[in-house]
Swiss-Prot record:
GO terms for biological process: aromatic amino acid family biosynthetic process, prephenate pathway; embryo development ending in seed dormancy; L-phenylalanine biosynthetic process. Its EC number is 2.6.1.1, 2.6.1.78, 2.6.1.79. Homodimer. This is Bifunctional aspartate aminotransferase and glutamate/aspartate-prephenate aminotransferase. Prokaryotic-type aspartate aminotransferase. Also has a prenate transaminase activity. Involved in the aromatic amino acids biosynthesis pathway via the arogenate route. Required for the transamination of prephenate into arogenate. Required for early development of the embryo. The modification N6-(pyridoxal phosphate)lysine is found at residue 306. Its cofactor is pyridoxal 5'-phosphate. Pathway: Amino-acid biosynthesis; L-phenylalanine biosynthesis; L-arogenate from prephenate (L-Asp route): step 1/1; Amino-acid biosynthesis; L-phenylalanine biosynthesis; L-arogenate from prephenate (L-Glu route): step 1/1. L-aspartate binds at residues 107, 193, 243, 445. Its main location: plastid. The gene is PAT. Belongs to the class-I pyridoxal-phosphate-dependent aminotransferase family. Gene3D superfamilies: Aspartate Aminotransferase, domain 1 (3.90.1150.10), Type I PLP-dependent aspartate aminotransferase-like (Major domain) (3.40.640.10).
Length: 475
């Protein structure tokens, strides 16, 4: 069964303290290419439940003929699978097989797309607006994006400085590919969104990861940044509000970072602002391009998925210097062409809801804040758990490392974020993403883009899961 092979991939890695291995077995919608070479110590010891264990030997039907060279390129083989996708798909397959799972892994709003936005897409279909558009995006949408950037962010762009893409992820990748050369360094504060490091590798660049501290709200220390910059430094990726931590960079800190960047002529900034509207007062959002002398150095990426609950519409955009945007457009023309005509019409309607999404988005943010407050208080009361209160987005990045080294009866040793996440999933049916996927193995990410009732049930399960572990560690 899919659910069996899915969890087996994770369980074997956790048992050995390794990242998820390659596999020819399917994990939901994800399929890896190398045969499983696993030691199923958890399964053999009887610690794992029967639904979790799967055979390590690939099916004969999946074995390729040795007479045909079906090898993959080194570029693809160097990439790591997204653990967010692995956990999300795994939880879904378990649910489909009849196992109830509380799913807190996916970074997807639980709200419906606003009705007026959905109607705009439906009307586009009814009116026959279903053909190719300009590669860069329809003029109406790019003009609306320019107005948004001017009114909300204080940034002046012309439509030819905007590139609409099939989601912000595509915008980010194209920006990295457009400005990075082999051997360049991409500076990435950790914890980071899972795709940043892999996108750098796709450009034959070297990701340079700078750890941050929970005691500093996971914010980049300017001194640490300065110590890592070299002549090879080409791109700094910043995400505020942050996925996975929810941290928001105050303007004063961004100004410090900008002063350091100004000393390095080759260094550009890729500012991921996809969670811009999901922010909790008194925190405020500052676009990096609005800082002194940073306009020409900054590539701003944003989109519609998070704020407007439009994840399935696949619509994002890049704003930046004209020649870089043109280069990204050239890439897009060879990769996907323009974004969906229907989604673009919906995007125009979304930007017409008012500043920061108007009352519609404000109601969503109000609900997210209520959920955040509940989780911070409820989980913060658990002994040994450390939390930095998020100021934006809809994630908690929780430090559970005090429980590493514990022994769980009927499970085994818990020595890292992967084994702890597996323990939560296998024994208590709560799906969360291990922190090592984001470059910080001390934590686990919880998405609170779900109902308060579900979160209350999750907290009770997490409490029960941690209770028996306390006896085996000094918490």
């Amino acid at each position: 069964m899919a659910s069996q092979s899915s969890v087996a991939v994770i369980s074997s890695a956790a048992a050995r303290g390794e990242s998820f291995p390659d596999s020819k077995k399917p994990i939901g919608s994800v399929r890896f290419q190398q045969p499983l070479r696993l030691s199923f110590s958890y399964c053999k010891s009887g610690n794992m439940s029967s639904r979790i264990c799967a055979m390590a030997k690939p099916n004969d039907a999946e074995t390729l003929s040795s007479s045909v060279d079906m090898s993959l390129s080194p570029r693809v083989q160097s990439l790591k699978p997204s653990k967010t996708m692995v956990i999300t798909d795994l939880a879904a397959t378990l649910v489909q097989s009849g196992v109830p799972v509380i799913r807190l892994a996916a970074g997807e709003p639980d709200f419906d797309t606003p009705k007026v936005v959905a109607e705009a897409g439906i009307n586009a279909i009814r009116e026959g607006f279903t053909r190719y558009t300009l590669n860069a995006g329809i003029t109406e949408l790019r003009e609306a994006i320019c107005r948004k950037l001017k009114e909300e962010n204080g940034l002046s762009y012309a439509p030819d400085q905007i590139l609409v893409s099939n989601g912000a992820k595509q915008s980010l990748l194209q920006a990295v590919l457009a400005v990075c050369s082999p051997g360049d360094e991409v500076i990435i504060p950790a914890p980071y969104w899972v795709s940043y490091t892999e996108q750098a590798r796709l450009a034959d660049a070297t990701p340079v990861v700078i750890p941050t501290k929970i005691s500093n709200n996971f914010l980049l220390d300017p001194k640490d940044l300065e110590s890592k910059l070299t002549e090879k430094s080409r791109l700094l990726i910043l995400c505020s509000p942050s996925n996975p931590t929810g941290s928001v960079y105050p303007k004063s800190l961004l100004e410090e970072i900008a002063r350091i960047i100004a000393k390095h002529p080759r260094l550009l900034v890729l500012s991921d602002e996809i969670y811009e509207h999901i922010i909790y007062a008194p925190a405020t959002h500052t676009s990096f391009a609005s800082l002194p002398d940073m306009y020409e150095r900054t590539l701003t990426v944003n989109g519609f998925s998070k704020a407007f609950a439009m994840t399935g519409w696949r619509l994002g955009y890049l704003a930046g210097p004209k020649h870089i945007v043109a280069a990204c457009s050239k890439l897009q023309g060879q990769v996907s062409s323009g974004a969906s005509s229907i989604a673009q019409k919906a995007g125009v309607a979304a930007l017409g809801l008012g500043k920061a999404g108007g009352e519609t988005v404000a109601e969503m943010v109000k609900a997210y804040r209520e959920r955040r407050d509940f989780l911070v208080k409820s989980l913060g009361d658990i002994k040994g758990v450390k939390i930095s209160e998020p100021q934006g987005a809809f994630y908690l990045f929780i430090d559970f490392s005090a429980y590493y080294g514990s022994e769980a009866e009927g499970f085994g040793l818990i020595n890292d974020s992967s084994s702890l996440a597996l323990y939560f999933l296998d024994k208590f049916q709560v799906a969360m993403v291990p922190g090592d996927a984001f470059g910080d193995d001390s934590c686990i990410r919880i998405s609170y883009a779900t109902s308060l009732d579900v979160l209350q049930a999750a907290v009770e399960k997490i409490r029960k899961a941690l209770e028996p572990l306390r006896a085996t560690v000094s918490v």
